[in-house]
Amino acid sequence: MKIGIDIGGSHVAIGLINGNGKIIAKEDQDLNNDLRSKDYCKKLVNTIIELITKILEEKKIDIKEISLIGIAIPGTVSETHIIKAKNLHIKDFNIVSEINKYFNIPIVLRNDAKCSAIAEKEYGSLKKYDDALFLTIGTGIGGAVYLGGKLLKPKKYEGFEIGHMVIKKDGIKCNCGRKGCFEKYASMKTFKDRIQSKFNNKNLTGKEIKELLTDKYYQKEIEEIIDEYIEDLSIGLANLINIFEPEVISIGGGFVHFKDILLEKLVNKLNKEDMLFNNQAVPKIITAKLKNDAGIVGSVIEYKD
């Protein structure tokens, strides 16, 4: 058995995975909002250790039965280090050695979008496609690309920073230090922030936001927010489609929870003739089959470059 860890911008999820790629036990926890604190990395590792220990104890499994721990995290990583994870304010942190202090077993560290894409290719929405683009849209935006059935992989570091493609010159400043990044306009965090700002309520839950989106009383205000969001999202996707011409785009992350409201509008927008250089190249747009579990599952899948 293996343990998959998915570290997101606001929470960490850990799953116990059997030989068939199925999650048989899962624990998750929200992360401390004080991301800039000096001991944040230590707290993150402690949270991971606690959740792993809880799963092992509940399932009555000895750590010796675990052959691998996989870690999926947004940002740029090496085999051992989180080189840069801007949304988590982590830089040059050897997370592998820290976890190995508690569990001395092999650990694989990968970019989260890449992990999700691998899982969707193996078990989910990308299984029958050779040329595909996977996007994870949540706190930020990450992505991975399959061309000719092979995962496109940078030579030096893990990571394919789609979210930091500039879509608006001199736009909003991003956590990365640049201005106008894709994820500052089209992440689910931005979408939710716009709704909370419009209704002057920063404490709206995901459930309350979904209820607002279908409330006819606020239809005009909601349509304005959705149209603006779809416009920004489609600009970034159109750029990627023009470059890679994928057969399909699969979207995971928090976007999946709002697919009934957003997906059809996105497809309609991309089908407009002025969005793409080749209007015959519009790919199929779908959502991730494994939903938010893709990162956990993909973190432990062995694959060949």
Q: What is each PLM-predicted segment?
A:
Residues 112, 138, 299:
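Active-site glycine-centered loops adjacent to acidic/histidine catalytic or metal-binding residues
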Residues 127-185:
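Glycine-rich phosphate-binding loop of actin/hexokinase-like ATP-binding domains
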Residues 109-113, 117:
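Short loop/edge segments at beta-strand edges and connector loops
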Residues 29-30, 89, 158:
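A generic structural motif
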